[in-house]
């Protein structure tokens, strides 16, 4: 029985929300619309068939036209629906409505024919009254800027357009939806495009916003079909004096759910599957209301990102919990009319599940990022296998197949104001390992399975400090403080020193020159050299490096004491300088359990997850700061001295005044101190003396100066008298600097035999025969040769990256791999005036090393040389020097009879080198103990006239293999100090006397492999095909018995063939001896 208080408008709106509302055009013009049944409770059984037929017709029409979400659920009739809870302010038609209801009740006892006629008359009357309501309400439909503004979605083009403010009829409003493009609307739309569009205007409370979201989301189908009704619904029925009427809206929403569930059989309502699907549908519908309906919160409401601070954040609406109890928006009272107890019980259960899921994941909705938390869903993490500068590796079980895999997690972050070039370069450095592994397929290469990218939602926030442009590392930087997860934005520190705002440098450029977080590792070295007093004075504080045209470190004045002293650390740079194999105290570094040096990838992208424990609860935004409490000063100096990203090569920068800035003289520093200056801003106008750590530049070359590369015009034009407006602008720009953190997951083969490092540390390894050791080394060279044949350089070969699986060596950890086939030179290297004197070999080119490569442009060498098996290499070359260097570096020989080659045989040219496309100065790449001199030196590759530039070949891997071979033959060292000492001497070309006397041929090969001149090193193909077989054959002659089980298949086949030849020779000898006896 329809309640006597039901008003015509409430009936129309109830139909609208269910998705069965007829558009105003249909009501005004179309007479063939199926009629809505409004039967009475007292209908007798004679009317069942007619009711069923009418409902079926109506359902087919509405379901087919509007493509309803719950198409399997019949459109309910209103026979048993109670509209007690719906209120309305419109008084039009109240009496007529009451009369119609009473008429309908009076006709309930009629026969079936009279009932049918009564229904038709009632429906016709409702339609007529609804037309009047629409026409009456259009006169009140004037939405001004002081009230709520609705942006509508054009269902055809998907463009956002704003309704006109003038009063129109429904037909006029619908026809003019696409023609309202005045200047102010365009300006408003353009401004709102970056906010995920808009939601309701000013509502005072949090509950108001939620109810409004429920309302407009439930009217989604209406919103797309007929906008005028939604305007009426919001402006005339639920807003009074521009404020939302919570009571009316709440009762309306209850009726929405009642109508939704009406007519659904009780057995379906009781089923857990239906309740789960129903609640999930509404939960997702309401949670994404802001993003779907294009309504905007007022500036005074900051619940979902409103206000000046969070206006530019398109994802802020997902970070705030909609309700403390969970994310469900349907209250338990909604089900009071339909099995309240069962529904409420199921709702509470799902609510608890949602709470647990939010606590575990703390993630954005999966609809925003499809791969989010894939690792947690599909893998069961067992243990941590190890960690390094490029990330951490975990042993995980895939739930689908039950197999174990090694999952490498590499974290990186991208800022929204980062230049596309820098962002692309960072992504390339992270993804290059995946690209390389996907290309490689070899028995001696770690097998690659899969890789994917996930967003780390709880760490996505803007950088609040003025140092926000300095990119963090690949560290996770996870903070266990739950409070930091509640907001996608973090408020800027109001007490931040204003001087930092003046020290702003270009975000995109400065991020290339200095990368701090993750650039330093914890070490076991003694920590008492410099920082003991510093720790006592400044315990539990962060000391950000400040920006300036300066050459030293300065502690921020805002967090340091006024009586801070200067600490000179220049002598440590000389001590730790490893650029030319000097007498550096390498033993101290080697004993630190950290062979790693931080390359262009590591300092920008990588950080071990062990750093999570070092971060305080407030430090989630402190990726720009160095904690002197937790970090080791020596490690910091070592990283600054060696890492390319920390010590970029600096070309002279031309100043505006016409002077050339020479970094070595320090003339460009604002402090004007000849040999020493501060990274902190030393404001000369205030006469402030630079405070904090100071780095002397007396013994530093131009390429070792810190933080002065890539300075842009913003820094040159900066003055010391910035006003408060500029500071405020800087803060606003910093608050909009959204930083998204991602994690790359790389799924590879898990080797249970651990690594070659574990094997070397086992005392029993010394008991292996030389043949067994050389057989293992042969597998390493085989894998390296395959990598080189694919046009790649590993650049980080070491025992820890050589994995063992059933006695088979597998090369892994391709975090520093360089695909030299995909690079292009962009900078001309320094010229070497000494021609190469290496003889030209005329043997055919080795196909194993025929790879497309690039050469720096010079006057006598073609800028690009493509080497292919089908084309003679000599036809692509125009210089004997280039041909000669290519012979020696690639192991391929060139036959050339061209006159050009002869004519240019004595011409001074640059040696042909591989070019690293990421940076000309690719120094500090790899592992300190095993990296070649050209990798460590900022001077570059050793040539005929000394070092040229940072161009090097794949022979840098041969250098690493030489050190590995030395360790394998020695069989491990007793102490770390002994290992460090011997490797240090080896790098200087010195082998122990006992080693050379016991292993003369191996000693000769090792010294060739670690030659400081890459031209003198053999190629992997030469070692594999020529040099190593000789050593293996000699070892077989020297040893009568060895363990055949530890030999590889090729070595065993070779031994069998030799044994077969010996047996055949003995048989023949025996046969000849028998014939002679006869």
From Swiss-Prot:
Catalysed reaction equations from the record: L-seryl-[protein] + ATP = O-phospho-L-seryl-[protein] + ADP + H(+); L-threonyl-[protein] + ATP = O-phospho-L-threonyl-[protein] + ADP + H(+)
Chain residue ranges for the region called Disordered: 31-61, 89-125, 154-190, 460-511, 579-627, 657-737, 823-867
Biased composition (Low complexity): 37-59, 89-117, 177-187, 664-687, 709-737
Biased composition (Acidic residues): 480-505, 583-627
Domain of life: Eukaryota
GO cellular component: a single term: cytoplasm
Cross-referenced InterPro entries: CC_SR_Kinase, Kinase-like_dom_sf, Prot_kinase_dom, Protein_kinase_ATP_BS, Ser/Thr_kinase_AS
Active site per the UniProt annotation: 796 (proton acceptor)
Composition skew (Polar residues), residue ranges: 694-707
Keywords of this entry: ATP-binding, Kinase, Nucleotide-binding, Serine/threonine-protein kinase, Transferase
Binding-site residues for ATP, renumbered to this chain: 385-393, 408
Any one Pfam family match given in the protein's UniProt record, by short name: Pkinase
Gene Ontology terms for molecular function: ATP binding; eukaryotic translation initiation factor 2alpha kinase activity; protein serine kinase activity
Matches recorded under PANTHER family: EUKARYOTIC TRANSLATION INITIATION FACTOR 2-ALPHA KINASE EIF2-ALPHA KINASE -RELATED (PTHR11042), SERINE_THREONINE-PROTEIN KINASE DDB_G0268642-RELATED (PTHR11042:SF193)
Protein name, per record: Probable serine/threonine-protein kinase DDB_G0268642
């Amino acid at each position: 029985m329809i309640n006597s208080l039901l008003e015509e408008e409430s009936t129309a709106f109830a139909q609208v929300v269910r998705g069965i509302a007829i558009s105003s055009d249909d009501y005004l013009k179309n007479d063939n619309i199926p009629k809505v049944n409004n039967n009475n409770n007292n209908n007798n059984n004679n009317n069942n068939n007619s009711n069923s037929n009418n409902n079926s017709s109506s359902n087919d029409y509405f379901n087919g036209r509007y493509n309803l979400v719950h198409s399997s659920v019949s459109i309910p009739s209103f026979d048993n629906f109670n509209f007690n809870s719906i209120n309305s302010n419109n008084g039009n038609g109240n009496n007529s409505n009451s009369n119609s209801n009473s008429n309908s009740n009076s006709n309930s006892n009629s026969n079936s024919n009279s009932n049918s006629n009564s229904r038709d008359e009632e429906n016709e009357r409702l339609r007529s009254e609804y037309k009047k309501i629409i026409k009456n309400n259009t006169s009140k439909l004037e939405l001004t800027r002081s009230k709520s503004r609705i942006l509508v979605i054009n269902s055809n083009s998907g463009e956002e357009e704003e309704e006109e403010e003038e009063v129109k009829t429904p037909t006029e409003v619908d026809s003019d939806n696409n023609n309202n493009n005045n200047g102010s609307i365009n300006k408003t739309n353009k401004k709102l495009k970056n906010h995920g569009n808009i939601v309701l205007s000013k509502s005072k409370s949090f509950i108001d916003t939620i109810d409004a979201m429920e309302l407009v989301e439930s009217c989604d189908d209406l919103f797309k079909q007929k906008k005028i009704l939604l305007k009426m619904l919001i402006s005339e029925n639920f807003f009074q004096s521009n404020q939302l009427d919570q009571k009316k809206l709440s009762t309306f929403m209850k009726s929405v759910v009642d109508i939704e569930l009406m007519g659904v059989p009780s057995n379906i309502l009781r089923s857990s599957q239906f309740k789960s699907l129903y609640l999930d549908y509404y939960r997702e519908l309401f949670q994404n209301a802001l993003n779907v309906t294009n309504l905007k919160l007022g500036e005074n409401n900051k619940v979902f990102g409103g206000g000046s601070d969070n206006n530019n954040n398109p994802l802020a609406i997902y970070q705030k919990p909609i309700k403390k109890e969970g994310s469900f928006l349907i209250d338990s009272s909604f089900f009071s009319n339909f099995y309240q107890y069962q529904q409420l019980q199921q709702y509470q259960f799902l609510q608890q599940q949602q709470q647990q899921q939010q606590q575990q994941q703390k993630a954005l909705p999966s609809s925003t990022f499809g791969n989010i938390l894939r690792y947690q869903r599909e893998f069961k993490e067992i243990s941590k296998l190890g960690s390094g500068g490029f990330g951490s590796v975990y042993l995980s079980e895939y739930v689908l197949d039950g197999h174990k895999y090694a999952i490498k997690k590499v974290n990186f972050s991208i800022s929204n104001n980062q230049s596309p070039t820098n962002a692309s370069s960072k992504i390339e450095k992270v993804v290059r390992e995946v690209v390389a592994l996907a290309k490689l397929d070899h028995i001696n290469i770690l097998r690659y399975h899969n890789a994917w990218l996930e967003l780390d939602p709880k760490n996505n926030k803007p950088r609040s400090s003025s140092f926000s442009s300095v990119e963090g590392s690949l560290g996770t930087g996870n903070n266990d403080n739950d409070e930091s997860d509640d907001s996608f934005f973090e408020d800027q520190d109001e007490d931040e020193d204003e001087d930092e705002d003046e020290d702003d440098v270009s975000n995109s450029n400065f991020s290339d020159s200095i990368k701090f977080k993750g650039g330093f590792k914890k070490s076991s070295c003694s920590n008492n050299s410099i920082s003991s007093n510093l720790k006592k004075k400044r315990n539990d504080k962060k000391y950000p490096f400040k920006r300036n045209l300066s050459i030293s470190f300065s502690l921020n004045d805002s967090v340091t004491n006024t009586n801070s002293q200067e600490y000179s650390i220049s002598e440590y740079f000389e001590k730790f300088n490893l650029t030319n194999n000097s007498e550096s105290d390498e033993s101290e570094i080697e004993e630190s359990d950290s062979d790693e040096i931080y390359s262009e990838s590591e300092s920008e992208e990588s950080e071990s997850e062990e750093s999570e424990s070092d971060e305080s609860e407030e430090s989630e935004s402190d990726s720009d700061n160095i904690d002197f409490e937790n970090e080791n000063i020596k490690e910091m100096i070592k990283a600054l001295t060696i890492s390319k990203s920390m010590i970029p090569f600096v070309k002279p920068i031309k100043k505006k005044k016409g002077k050339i800035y020479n970094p070595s003289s320090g003339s460009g520093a604002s402090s004007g101190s000849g040999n020493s200056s501060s990274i902190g801003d030393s404001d000369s106008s205030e006469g402030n003396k630079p405070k904090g750590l100071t780095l002397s530049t007396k013994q530093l070359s131009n390429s070792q100066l810190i933080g002065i590369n890539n300075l842009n015009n913003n820094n040159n034009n900066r003055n010391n008298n910035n006003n408060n407006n500029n500071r405020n602008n800087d803060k606003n720009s910093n608050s909009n600097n959204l930083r998204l953190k991602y994690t790359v997951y790389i799924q590879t083969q898990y080797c249970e035999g651990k690594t070659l490092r574990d094997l070397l540390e086992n005392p029993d390894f010394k008991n292996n025969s030389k043949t067994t050791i050389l057989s293992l080394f042969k597998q390493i060279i085989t894998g390296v040769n395959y990598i080189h044949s694919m046009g790649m350089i590993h650049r980080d070969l070491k025992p820890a990256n050589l994995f063992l699986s059933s006695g088979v060596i597998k090369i892994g950890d391709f975090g520093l791999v360089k695909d030299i086939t995909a690079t292009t030179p962009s900078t001309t290297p320094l010229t070497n005036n000494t021609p190469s004197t290496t003889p030209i070999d005329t043997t055919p080119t080795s196909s194993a090393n025929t790879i497309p490569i690039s050469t720096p442009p010079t006057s006598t060498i073609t800028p690009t040389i493509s080497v292919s098996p089908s084309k003679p290499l000599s036809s692509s070359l125009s210089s004997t020097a280039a041909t000669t260097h290519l012979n020696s570096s690639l192991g391929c020989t060139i036959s050339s009879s061209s006159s050009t080659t002869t004519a240019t045989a004595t011409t001074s040219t640059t040696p042909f080198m591989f070019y690293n496309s990421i940076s000309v100065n690719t120094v500090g790449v790899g592992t300190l103990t095993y990296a070649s001199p050209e990798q460590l030196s900022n001077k570059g590759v050793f040539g005929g006239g000394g070092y040229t530039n940072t161009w090097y070949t794949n022979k840098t891997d041969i250098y690493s293999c030489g050190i590995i071979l030395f360790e394998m033959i020695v069989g491990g060292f007793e102490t770390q100090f002994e290992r460090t000492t011997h490797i240090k001497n080896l790098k200087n070309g010195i082998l122990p006397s006992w080693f050379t006397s016991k292993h003369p041929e191996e000693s000769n090969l090792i010294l060739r492999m670690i030659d400081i001149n890459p031209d003198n090193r053999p190629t992997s193909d030469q070692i594999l095909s020529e040099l190593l077989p000789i050593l293996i054959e000699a070892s077989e002659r020297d040893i009568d018995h060895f363990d055949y089980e530890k030999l590889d298949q090729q070595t065993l086949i070779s031994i069998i063939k030799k044994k077969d030849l010996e047996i055949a020779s003995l048989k023949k000898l025996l046969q000849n001896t028998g014939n002679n006896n006869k």
